[in-house]
Every structure is written in structure tokens, then in C-alpha cells.
């Protein structure tokens, strides 16, 4: 949406108020696009990180491989809950998975995590 379109959507009183502040807001071009949305991938990433268990898993696994039972014990959570969070993290490619027989071990995919952090920085800073 352009600044001009935003102004046109306001009532007369609001428009006068906003027009007074345009220079102070350093908005000089009424055709400038105002972007308000993040990409879907970034929204999903922020949602994933907003959960303290998932954030804890990523932090705990940044330098080590661990199995589900150890992760559950370290976070004092039920193993089925941890498995649910691991699936969510794997779906976003934020975890590496290694299998040894029936056991599965997990580690944070730092390259993918860095990619999301870079995208977030690029969008917001």
C-alpha cells in the first residue's frame, strides 16, 4: 500500500493531522510503498522460536547430538511432548537427525538457523 492510499482512506480530520506529521516522519514521497507483512517463512520461524521448549531445544542442541529421552529429561518434560516439538523443528529444517538402530539423535541445524536470522534481520533492520 502506498502512503497516498493510506491518506486517502482517512477521514478529513485524520488526514489533516497525518499531513502535519509527514515531514517529521521523513515521508516525502506519497508514492512510497509501506510494507507491513513478513514472509510466511519468517512468520513460521518466529512462531517456532516463541515457544520456550522449542527455543530451549535449539539452544541445548547447538553443539551436541542428543536423543529424545535425554532432551525430555533435561527439559523436565514428557517425551511425547518433546517428540512433538522435534517434529515441528524438523519440519522447518532447524534440526539434523541421525539414526543409530532404533535411536534417533538430534542437533541444531546452525546453517538453517543462521539463514532465518539473516532473513529476519534483512526484513526488520
Regions of interest found by a model, annotated:
Residues 90-100:
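Beta-hairpin "wing" of winged helix-turn-helix
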Residues 64, 78-81:
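Helix-turn-helix DNA-binding motif, specifically the short coil turn and the N-cap/start of the second
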Residues 85:
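Residues within the DNA-recognition helix of helix-turn-helix
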Amino acid at each position: 500500500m502506498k502512503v497516498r492510499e493510506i491518506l486517502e482512506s482517512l477521514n478529513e480530520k485524520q488526514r489533516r493531522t497525518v499531513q502535519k506529521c509527514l515531514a517529521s516522519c521523513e515521508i516525502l514521497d506519497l508514492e512510497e510503498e509501506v510494507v507491513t507483512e513478513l514472509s510466511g517463512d519468517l512468520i513460521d520461524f518466529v512462531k517456532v522460536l516463541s515457544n520456550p521448549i522449542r527455543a530451549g531445544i535449539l539452544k541445548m542442541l547447538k553443539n551436541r547430538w542428543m536423543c529424545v529421552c535425554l532432551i525430555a529429561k533435561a527439559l523436565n518434560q514428557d517425551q511425547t511432548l518433546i517428540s512433538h516439538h522435534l517434529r515441528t523443528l524438523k519440519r522447518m529444517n532447524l534440526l539434523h537427525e541421525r539414526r543409530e538402530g532404533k535411536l534417533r539423535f538430534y542437533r541444531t541445524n546452525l546453517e538453517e538457523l543462521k539463514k532465518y536470522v539473516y532473513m529476519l534481520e534483512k526484513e526488520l533492520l
